[in-house]
Amino acid sequence: MSSHLPKFDLLVVGAGINGAGIARDAAGRGLKVLIVERGDIACGTSQWSTKLIHGGLRYLEQYEFRLVRESLAEREVVLRQAPHLVEPLLFVLPHEPHLRPAWLLRAGLFLYDHLGRRETLPRSFAVNLSKTPWGAGLKPTFGTGFVYADARVDDARLVVCNVMDAALHDADVRVHTALVSARRDHDGAGPFWRATLRDDAGVTSEATAKVLVNAAGNWVKRVREAINGVPSKESIRHVKGSHIIVPRVHEGTHAYILQNADKRIVFIIPYQDRYSLIGTTDVAMDGFEEPAISEQEVNYLLDLANTYLAQPLARSDVVWTYSGVRPLYDDGSADPSSITRDYVFKLDTDDGRGAAALSIYGGKITTYRKLAEHALQDLAPHLPSMPARWTANAVLPGGDLPPGGFGELLGELTGRYSRLPGEVVRGLAHRHGTTALSILGDAMAPSDLGEDFSQGLTAAEIDYLVDEEWARTGEDVLWRRTKCGLGMSKANRDRVDAYVARVARTLPVPA
């Protein structure tokens, strides 16, 4: 069975953070947008980040001043547009004189404070770790430290919210739908793309679009070569980053940034109240399918953490791990840690005769919005009369908080729904912001939310995730739309799988 979709201005391939951001920006400008994703939203690298919105302090050592400046500016923008998903976080950097001298750290932090616009976060400052709570959890031998501010984010939810906003601006969103083929064509109106799509049920669709955006992440080179029909000159470097989750290593709300003898840095970040997230590694990979952490990486992270922590961690303390492969533009660097994290665009037009295709290499979650603006700027000659950029001051769904910010929203929710479990209300507030009000509705008792799956996840939220956020499997719900899978028993995860499958079966098939 096959169907023909309406004509589009923009076909976006890939619903990671880059594709989601471009689809949102384009749809908000009034363009007709189709975004397709072979799996689930954020199912690739975007869900496996260190979960930070940051300027990239370490990139200063690699002289990536443009990237750091843009990242610092975008950090402020993302804090405003998704205040329920992004929150300020203070980082403590213990001084290790044999690794980097104090003057170098002060100079780097001075640049970090002044390179980009800072509206909400404080400047860096020095602290005495042995005599203040800033050193909580560290060995008493550490004396001097430096504190600076960045932010943390629920990475997968940020992607989902961008796709939701694209849909609110009339974008056509197709998950579990692969691009089978795409070829250039012409008619009286000019060049365009003719694409064939196939969903997981085997149903094919034909779509046409003026331009194509290849935001396929690790598959970007494959897609580019397939649609152009010739080998790509540019190469991609696959670099695996792995993280471990352990029980909370200190009671403070701050994070640690740890220096290692190999000149790399690793973060220890408070995670979901009960845990600490430790990462990341940088390992060059030949492939990128189903990455997994190695024992060597686990030991690397544990050994570095134990260099600093007063209470050493053992292998048995690791409760969960995750790995993602970053699709970085090959800039010729031999060291995986030195490869640029900046984004690179490649525009193909069949020597100016055919429809345009823009391929996206690299990029960071922090700069996704600016990447989207730059992508549409490059495509402007192929999309005449495109309206002006608009996302800098626009909040994402759920981000329209009251004047008192997230604290006021949480107070309003806990007061109105005082008879509901606090874990449920807090979780909905953090994941959905003001949209939590519509999910909770008139609920007066726990039974009004349907089945309870533990970890603050209820049937009412799952129904919303399936109906409004394209969740189709238990994995979509437990690890991307929420992070409730961590700490949930296998029996309850199985219950979630069964419930989602039952609810998703009732959804109408897209036209």
PLM segments and residue spans:
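Glycine-rich FAD pyrophosphate-binding loop
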Residues: 27-48
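Flavin (primarily FAD) binding-site architecture
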Residues: 214-229
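Dinucleotide-binding Rossmann-like beta1-alpha1 core, especially the glycine-rich loop
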Residues: 51-135
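C-terminal catalytic lobe of FAD-dependent flavoproteins
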Residues: 141, 149, 155-158, 165, ...
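A conserved short coil-to-beta-strand element within the FAD-binding core of flavoproteins
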Residues: 175-193
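Beta1/beta-strand and adjacent pyrophosphate-binding region of the FAD-binding site
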Residues: 4-18
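Core beta-strand elements of the Rossmann-like FAD/NAD(P) dinucleotide-binding domain
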Residues: 6-8, 201-211
